[in-house]
Amino acid sequence: MRDEIKTSDANLEIDWRSICPISSALDVIGDKWSILIVRDLIIHGPRTYSQFLESPEGISTNILATRLELLTNLKLIERINPDKSSRNNAYQLTPAGAALRPVLENLGKWAALHLSEFHSNILKM
């Protein structure tokens, strides 16, 4: 089940694995980078492209650009430009993106509770 999402440069395709809502959510935010972009916006608020690159996980520029475009076109994040200079473009969560906050908080709590035996340095929530 493939759907096209219109973008400014080209069309991105999402290959939906099934009609299951959980599977569909994972098709969008289930990859490492998309969920970490959302995490950074939840924790820090609006972020610039270069601030995302400073993340300790070390996202590459091409992956970051692709994920920002995908999340923007899916209306989970939006680009803001306070002074109309392209150098100062930033991204912030939309209401749909902000609705992921309790999901990520619960995922973090679950990981802290159930993975600490295997990951001795995991942060406690």
Residue ranges and their predicted role:
Residues E4, P102-M125:
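Amphipathic alpha-helical dimerization/coiled-coil segments
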Residues G30, D83-L107:
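Basic, amphipathic "hinge/linker" alpha-helix immediately C-terminal to the N-terminal HTH DNA-binding motif
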Residues C20-S60, Q92:
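N-terminal helix-turn-helix DNA-binding core of bacterial DNA-binding proteins
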Residues M1-I29:
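N-terminal leader segment of winged-helix/HTH proteins
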Residues A25, D40, Q51, R67, ...:
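Residue-level recognition of specific faces of alpha-helices
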Residues K6-W16, W33-V38, T48-Y49, P102:
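Short histidine
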Residues L53-S86:
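Canonical helix-turn-helix DNA-binding module
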Residues M1-I5, R67, E78-I80, I122:
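Short amphipathic alpha-helical interaction elements located at domain edges
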